[in-house]
Design a protein with these regions (language model features):
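Short glycine-rich phosphate-binding loop at a beta-alpha junction
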Residues: 2-7, 129-131
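Cofactor-cradling patches in redox/metallo enzymes
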Residues: 5-15, 70
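Non-catalytic alpha/beta scaffold blocks inside enzyme catalytic domains
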Residues: 25, 29, 33-296
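Phosphodiester-processing cores and adjacent nucleic acid-binding clamps
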Residues: 19
Length: 297
């Protein structure tokens, strides 16, 4: 069976085209290549209910399994701004230098359990924001950790935000580039792997690998066939940020050599497979994309 993998920097248009191409051939597509236990079809679970601007008015901020100073420095600066205005910051996870003071509640699952089961009167008395990082949900019990974080946010009537570290992740999940059971289920029995710029994953022997991307990274070294695609700076593309807001990236320069726009490579390949995708331009693709996900308009 064919399997499509969506890398961290793929625009929504390419993820959507890959999904339609691979699923049209009876295969499956997966964007959670780091193993994150994010729930397909539940946007409040993989994006949250908060906006980044909510940080500015928060009276308390709870960080679970994330290091915003490293993962999102600009967002961390906003947290520091809220702290400087009197917001309390709590951390469940590794104790690191966040450039502001915080209450460290522990670094293991027991600390999270204690947080969820404990006295939350302080959180209830403040405008509280819960921020959950990817590090908390990549382990085998990631789904349970996510559920506990959401339960804490619900009990304390807090706003909830998932901090993503992959630019393509939210948009790819919005268009359904996921497989029930995650990466392991998608890769089971795969004989052809179409790798759309996923360089953080080890693909085992046996499968025929097609790599479409812009850099000679791990994915390209494992490939049997390489299709040079444009980098995110070399094509117009849609991305959805960590708060679920669609954003348009504009081309800064043209792709070198024979490299093409990523959606166009997939469209051309679909013609060779006699399974032509129903769009001949980026505008037509976006029309189909918005029809599938109106909030991406």
């Amino acid at each position: 069976k064919p399997v499509g993998l969506v890398g961290d920097l793929a625009p929504v248009e390419a993820a959507f085209a890959l999904k339609e191409l691979i699923e049209g051939q009876g295969g499956s597509v997966e964007c959670r290549t780091d193993g994150a236990h994010l729930p397909a079809g539940n946007r409040s679970g993989y994006v949250g209910t908060a906006s980044i601007a909510d940080i500015d008015s928060a009276g308390a901020i709870m960080l679970i399994g994330c290091n915003p100073a490293l993962e999102a420095p600009v967002l961390n600066a906003r947290i520091r701004g809220a702290w400087s205005r009197g917001a309390k910051v709590g951390v469940v996870g590794e104790a690191v230098d966040l450039t502001y003071e915080y209450f460290h509640l522990g670094s293991d699952r027991a600390a999270l359990d204690k947080l969820v089961a404990g006295d939350n009167s302080d959180a209830l008395s403040r405008e509280t924001l819960v921020i959950l990082g990817q590090g908390a949900i990549r382990e085998a019990d990631g789904a349970a950790v996510l559920a506990k974080a959401m339960a804490f946010a619900d009990h304390t009537e807090s706003k909830f935000l998932v901090l993503h570290s992959a630019a393509s992740r939210v948009g790819a999940m919005d268009v359904g580039a996921v497989t029930e059971g995650g990466l392991a289920a998608a890769m089971e029995g795969a004989d052809v792997v179409y790798n759309l710029g996923a360089d953080e994953i080890e693909i085992g022997d046996g499968a025929f690998v097609i790599y479409q991307g812009s850099h000679g990274d791990r994915g390209a070294h494992r490939a049997d066939v390489i299709l040079p695609g444009a980098a995110y700076t070399e094509e117009n593309g849609l991305f959805v940020n960590t708060e679920g807001r669609p954003q348009l990236a504009l081309r800064a320069g043209f792709a070198p050599g024979e490299a093409k726009e990523n959606w166009a490579i997939l469209r051309a390949l679909s013609g060779e497979l006699e399974a032509k995708l129903p769009y001949d331009s980026l505008a037509q693709l976006r029309q189909a994309l918005v029809k599938a996900g109106p909030h991406l308009a």
